[in-house]
Amino acid sequence: MTLFPRIASGGALFLLGAVGAWAQSDAKDLYMDKCAVCHGADGAGKTAKGKKLKLKDVHETAAKMKADEMVKIVENGKPPDMDAYGKQFNAAQIKGLVEYYRSLAK
């Protein structure tokens, strides 16, 4: 293997690690800023907006939905109540949000 492919593959691994580190460290902040107003800090959906929308508790949602289904809902929304965030957030951010939300059920 020549030097360039080694450097390129090492750089790619570094970037993947950086994305993973972002998802772990900042997903909670993003969730609290954008999601908790409806879903609640604990994922219970017991906020004023959550009650109005009749949101389900994270324990029920996480048990019934796979992570990839949740990713699609965050990306595309769930009209009429859930806005789409696919244009606001990148794939790593959305994945991090879903992972953080699901972690609230543990």
Report each predicted region and the residues it spans:
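Electron-transfer interface patches adjacent to heme c in soluble/periplasmic c-type cytochromes
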Residues: 56-68, 85-93
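C-terminal capping alpha-helices of c-type cytochrome domains
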Residues: 73-75, 80, 86-106
